[in-house]
């Protein structure tokens, strides 16, 4: 699973989810990609589930690139804890994804296989997404 090797601080503020993505809006590596249409926090487990869904479908052909990284810790209090008593312990790592961000890219496979693999990965993600091609536009 994806987590940072080390961070300067153990706990951080929650990131801002408003606004469009400032970078990472274009396909850089593959031929087809998943682009987010809504803001969301994507956890390291969701990224891993989407990666496994894609790689199992394409089998040995093609290549998958993950262009987001969960670099922010999200904290939670234990269940049944009373209010107060400080900030909770880091529970999981998230990537702050804004609308327009390209999250996964795929290359080296036909359009039909890429489309189905990316559709399976979209089912694992917590927001609305679309599949785009390098030539331009939706598929």
Curated annotation (Swiss-Prot):
Gene3D superfamilies named among the record's database cross-references: Ribosomal protein L10e/L16 (3.90.1170.10)
Superkingdom, taxonomy of origin: Bacteria
CDD domains associated with the record: Ribosomal_L16_L10e
Region (Disordered): 1-22
One of the Pfam families matching this protein, by short name: Ribosomal_L16
UniProt keyword annotations, A-Z: Ribonucleoprotein, Ribosomal protein, RNA-binding, rRNA-binding, tRNA-binding
UniProt GO BP: translation
Residue stretches of biased makeup (Basic residues): 1-16
GO CC terms of this entry: cytosolic large ribosomal subunit
PROSITE patterns: RIBOSOMAL_L16_2 (PS00701)
Disulfide bonds: none
Function summary: Binds 23S rRNA and is also seen to make contacts with the A and possibly P site tRNAs.
Name listed for the protein in its UniProt record: Large ribosomal subunit protein uL16
């Amino acid at each position: 699973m994806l987590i940072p090797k080390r961070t300067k601080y153990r706990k951080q503020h929650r990131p801002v989810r408003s606004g469009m993505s400032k970078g990472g809006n274009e396909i850089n590596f593959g031929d087809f990609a998943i682009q987010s249409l809504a803001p969301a926090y994507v956890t390291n487990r969701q990224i891993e589930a989407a990666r496994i869904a894609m790689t199992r479908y394409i089998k040995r052909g093609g290549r998958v690139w993950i262009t987001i990284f969960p670099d922010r810790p999200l904290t939670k209090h234990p269940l049944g804890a009373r209010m107060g008593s400080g900030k909770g312990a880091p529970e999981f790592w998230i990537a702050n994804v804004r609308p327009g961000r390209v999250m996964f890219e795929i290359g080296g496979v036909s359009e039909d296989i890429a489309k189905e693999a990316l559709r399976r990965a979209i089912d694992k993600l917590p927001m609305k997404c679309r599949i785009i091609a390098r030539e331009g536009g939706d598929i």
